[in-house]
């Protein structure tokens, strides 16, 4: 068992709170979180932080309300702000966890806390690794939980992660009787499986934590060795061996945490990319992948309502920015080869929008569907997605796509009244 001073001496050089002034502590009332609360309360001046308490009453035990009342009383006595939420809905481990972290996130955002602090320790880490092994998780997910990671508008910090449960001091806390219920996998791991495995190897927990560390280092090394590869570039991707492609795609999917593909879905996705057949392929949870001649990209599907909202109206003699372009009725003073000018035969407002089904543009003696124009000119899917349609008086007067502009052919008796000028915005 360690004292709080000894714990402080070990973590002070890790500078967990260097960039934080207001931190929110997740407190259940159990021994771990009560230790965290007392520790941060005692050392908040040395750490240069101010603390707040977040507590979720899961309403699953008769003692829950008295535990909530105790924490409110403690917070009032020590002049610490406290935020409480009551769980609603059908209870499960996952539902409760999702509720807690959604609540913590909302409190951080509303009250300007830049860090959430939880009391996870090395025993929790070992339990998590063993649970993931039992569930058949990917190798990547055996890296365990991190001491610091992004969360909400700031970070999630676990300062006790390098300490074991037996390192924490004895302190007043509440015993959660549900921690003994074997209907929950974590409780079976904690109360049944780990004790048996520790009989075979007393250092089994340390072994699991070392596995998590080495696994984390392995994937960090892979990232560093492949950071010169543009994963979404089909030429570069297909130049790699099958094994490297496998982990490059896993790395790329880390950017879409809510996509959560099953192993069979991942294998199917990898095969789609390897064959590089152009088109759209729907995945799940409103995500799809589209592949063109040169690259692939995973994107969340934009609802039709959002596409409608994306439309903008440009009034004569005004200006606006739309997507990556600046639209105005005044030319630049200097000669700019990059500026596009469009003759206007009407001064009515111009609608800027995306392509819609059935769109066509008149080229004088003939008209052409814009969909067919895109196909014939061999524009990539990404370029088609970003094309801008200019519509005036219910006619399409221009199409802006890639580095090209297509104009409606003027009629014989049209008189030019003005010009519209388009400039590509520089990305800083």
From Swiss-Prot:
Catalytic function, reaction form: cytidine(34) in tRNA(Ile2) + L-lysine + ATP = lysidine(34) in tRNA(Ile2) + AMP + diphosphate + H(+)
EC number(s) reported in the record: 6.3.4.19
Subcellular location(s) of the protein: Cytoplasm
Organism domain of life: Bacteria
GO CC field: cytoplasm
HAMAP family noted in UniProt: tRNA_Ile_lys_synt
Domain writeup: The N-terminal region contains the highly conserved SGGXDS motif, predicted to be a P-loop motif involved in ATP binding.
Family statement drawn from the similarity comment of this UniProt entry: Belongs to the tRNA(Ile)-lysidine synthase family.
GO terms, biological process: tRNA modification
Name of protein: tRNA(Ile)-lysidine synthase
Function: Ligates lysine onto the cytidine present at position 34 of the AUA codon-specific tRNA(Ile) that contains the anticodon CAU, in an ATP-dependent manner. Cytidine is converted to lysidine, thus changing the amino acid specificity of the tRNA from methionine to isoleucine.
Protein residues bound to ATP: 28-33
GO molecular function, one term: ATP binding
Source organism of this protein record: Streptococcus pyogenes serotype M1
Alphabetic keyword roster: ATP-binding, Cytoplasm, Ligase, Nucleotide-binding, tRNA processing
């Amino acid at each position: 068992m360690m004292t709080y001073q000894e714990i402080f001496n070990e973590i002070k050089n890790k500078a967990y709170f260097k960039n934080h002034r207001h931190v929110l502590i997740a407190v259940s009332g159990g021994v771990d979180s009560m230790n965290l609360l007392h520790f941060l309360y005692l050392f908040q001046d040395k750490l240069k932080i101010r603390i707040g308490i977040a507590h979720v009453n899961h309403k699953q035990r008769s003692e829950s309300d008295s535990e909530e009342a105790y924490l409110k009383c403690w917070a009032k006595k020590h002049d610490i702000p406290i935020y409480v939420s009551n769980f609603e809905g059908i209870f499960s481990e996952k539902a409760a966890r999702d509720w807690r972290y959604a609540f913590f996130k909302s409190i951080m955002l509303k009250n300007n806390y830049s860090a959430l602090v939880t009391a996870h320790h090395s025993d929790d880490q070992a339990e998590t690794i063993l649970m993931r092994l039992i569930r058949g998780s990917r190798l990547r997910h055996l890296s365990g939980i991190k001491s610091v990671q992004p969360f909400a508008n700031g970070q999630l910090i676990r300062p006790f992660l390098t300490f074991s449960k037996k390192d924490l001091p004895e302190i007043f806390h509440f015993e959660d009787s549900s921690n003994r219920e074997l209907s929950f996998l974590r409780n079976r791991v904690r109360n049944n499986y780990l004790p048996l495995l520790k009989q075979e190897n007393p250092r089994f927990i340390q072994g699991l934590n070392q596995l998590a560390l080495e696994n984390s280092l392995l994937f960090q090394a892979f990232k560093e060795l492949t950071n010169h590869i543009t994963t979404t570039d089909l030429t570069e991707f297909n130049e790699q061996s099958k094994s490297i492609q496998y982990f490059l795609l896993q790395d790329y999917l880390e950017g879409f945490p809510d996509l959560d593909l099953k192993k069979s879905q991942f294998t199917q996705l990898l095969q789609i990319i390897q064959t590089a057949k152009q088109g759209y392929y729907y995945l799940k949870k409103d995500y799809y992948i589209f592949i063109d001649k040169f690259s692939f990209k995973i994107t969340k599907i934009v609802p039709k309502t959002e596409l409608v909202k994306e439309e903008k109206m440009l009034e004569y003699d005004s200006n606006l920015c739309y997507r990556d372009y600046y639209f105005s009725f005044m030319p630049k003073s200097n000669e700019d080869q990059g500026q596009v000018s469009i003759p206007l035969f009407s001064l009515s407002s111009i609608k800027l929008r995306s392509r819609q089904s059935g769109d066509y543009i008149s080229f004088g003696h003939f008209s052409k569907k814009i969909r067919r124009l895109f196909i014939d000119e061999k524009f990539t899917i990404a370029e088609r997605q970003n094309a801008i349609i200019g519509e005036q008086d219910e006619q399409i007067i221009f199409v802006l796509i890639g580095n090209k502009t297509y104009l409606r052919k003027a009629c014989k008796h049209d008189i030019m009244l003005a010009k519209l000028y388009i400039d590509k915005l520089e990305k800083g």
